[in-house]
């Protein structure tokens, strides 16, 4: 392949390599994909006519008009590999082959997605007894299948699963997915949207390979499943952005959830910038579910040109307040979620200062699509069990932030695979400022927490107070605990730290210099462990 083709392929993926590890401003990023996928309702029981009917329904239901453009064919289309290793589709389910179905989808003005497996055998072969899924994965056929999927058949998206690669071959995730993506880049003349499906956040390497990645096990149409996935994604906002997204899995709208649960499901997927892939039968979707899926004001949060994921700023009474900028970075308009995962009504009282806003503030309920009364001090709502208020909030002025939570940081060596004996992780702690800390920080120069957008209106000298949790006495390294705090490359070391955990949250204070605008602050310890980190605050020195 010529280099010109390689440059065209995966340009969106390459965009985020630098910016996720260090600050950079962008004016526009490619938003999460929107469409329909076959797996939730049909699993491997798909065929050519079924896919065409769903594509037709996408148009007839008007979903394409609000942004749903992908028709993704998941597991179940495989037939076999012949003696030359060439992949064939299922002769009964797809008698006219996959190029014909991709062409049909394209003829409707839509985009076509396909599925494969990083190993040899598909998830359908393991979990659904599909013998046609044996030996049809990408393992050993990376270049050949990539050419078939994208150049011969013409697909625009691929989801790459990990059942055969992980459960059978025990391959290492980063190495295996890098091998596959490199093969696609070598043969692909187009920008393919790629999804990595490892059922847990796989590591910070993923943003250089994929546009989206799964962060949890498969969804199902139950409140417990929706709640579980939201919980998994609450503290992953720093790992999304610049056209790369945490995938909360396909939507279960229209598959039996209660109305308030559907509103929470769709609203949280939107404000957290997950891909929006409908998973129900579009020819039989309830009217209320269809109306929700076509809510342009919620969709606008998901497709916002900033491409940000909402993050937690307040946690009380077991409810969560999440916020993100929309329309303009550090502007006066923000999206807010008041999320109640509990079995009781939750009363939210959110000071405007928590949202970094002040002055008369206008509020719009995006689910109900109606304006609420303006406020000048705090936002207050009662939210029913399993419910969520999704709000557009517009203040008069934007305030300079003073508190940065540990759980909002980019953790350079974080993953959720559970393979590391002592990997950096999120750890609940009741008296922490947000009820959450990060643990197993430090011990290596690369095992740090970093805040890439610490903002100062004017710059100057600040008092920085770091709150932390003293180590347990049983931990042998307790006397060696230290914090190395680097501000725009300038390091301050705090090594005389509290060692009595019974005293609760401790703190250490020093002065730092911030530049006007955005600053990068990194906390860790190169040669010893750091204590569990709660947050830090910044106060200008007058």
Task: Indicate residue ranges for each PLM-predicted region.
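Bacterial Sec-dependent N-terminal signal peptides
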Residues: 1-25
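Carbohydrate-binding surface patches
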Residues: 269-272, 277-279, 316-357, 386, ...
């Amino acid at each position: 392949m010529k280099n010109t083709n390689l440059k065209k392929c995966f340009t969106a993926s390459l965009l985020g390599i630098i910016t996720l590890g260090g600050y950079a401003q962008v004016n526009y990023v490619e938003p999460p994909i929107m469409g329909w996928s076959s797996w939730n309702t049909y699993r491997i029981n798909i065929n050519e006519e079924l896919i065409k009917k769903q594509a037709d329904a996408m148009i007839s239901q008007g979903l394409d008009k609000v942004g749903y453009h992908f028709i993704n064919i998941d597991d179940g289309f495989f037939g076999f590999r012949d003696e030359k290793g060439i992949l064939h589709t299922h002769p009964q389910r797809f008698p006219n082959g996959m190029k014909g179905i991709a062409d049909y989808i394209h003829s409707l003005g839509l985009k076509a997605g396909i599925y494969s497996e990083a190993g040899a055998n598909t998830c359908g072969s393991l979990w659904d007894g599909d013998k046609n899924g044996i030996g049809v994965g990408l393992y050993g056929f990376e270049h050949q299948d990539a050419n078939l999927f994208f150049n011969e058949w013409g697909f625009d998206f691929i989801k790459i699963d990990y059942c055969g690669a992980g459960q059978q071959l025990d391959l290492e995730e980063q190495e295996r997915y890098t091998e596959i993506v490199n093969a696609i880049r070598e043969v692909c003349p187009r920008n393919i949207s790629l999804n990595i499906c490892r059922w847990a956040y796989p590591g910070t390497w993923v943003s250089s390979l994929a546009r989206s990645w799964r962060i949890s096990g498969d969804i199902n149409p139950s409140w417990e499943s929706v709640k579980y996935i939201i919980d998994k994604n609450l503290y992953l906002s720093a790992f999304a952005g610049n056209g790369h997204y945490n995938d909360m899995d396909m939507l279960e709208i229209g598959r039996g959830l209660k109305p308030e649960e559907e509103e929470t499901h769709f609203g949280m997927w939107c404000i957290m910038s997950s891909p929006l892939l409908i998973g129900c039968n579009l020819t039989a979707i309830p009217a209320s579910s269809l109306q929700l899926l076509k809510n342009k004001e919620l969709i606008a949060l998901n497709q916002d040109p900033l491409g940000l994921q909402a993050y937690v700023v307040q946690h009380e009474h077991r409810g969560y307040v999440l916020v993100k900028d929309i329309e303009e970075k550090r502007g006066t308009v923000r999206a807010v979620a008041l999320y109640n995962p509990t079995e009781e009504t939750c009363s939210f009282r959110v000071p405007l200062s928590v949202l970094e806003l002040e002055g008369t503030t206008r509020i719009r309920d995006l689910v109900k699509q109606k304006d609420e009364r303006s406020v000048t001090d705090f936002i207050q709502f009662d939210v029913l069990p399993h419910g969520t208020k999704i709000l557009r909030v517009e203040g008069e002025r934007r305030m300079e932030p003073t508190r940065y939570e540990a759980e909002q940081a980019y953790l350079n060596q974080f993953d959720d695979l559970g393979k590391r004996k002592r990997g950096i992780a999120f750890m609940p702690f009741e008296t922490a400022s947000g009820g959450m800390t990060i643990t197993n920080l430090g011990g290596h120069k690369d095992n740090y927490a970093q805040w890439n957008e610490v903002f100062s209106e004017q710059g100057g000298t600040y008092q920085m107070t770091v709150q932390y949790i003293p180590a347990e006495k049983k931990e042998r390294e307790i006397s060696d605990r230290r914090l190395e705090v680097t501000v725009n490359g300038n390091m301050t070391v705090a090594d005389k730290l509290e060692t009595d955990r019974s005293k609760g949250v401790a703190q250490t204070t020093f002065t730092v210099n911030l530049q006007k605008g955005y600053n990068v602050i990194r906390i860790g310890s190169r040669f010893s462990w750091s204590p569990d980190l709660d947050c830090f605050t910044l106060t200008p020195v007058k």
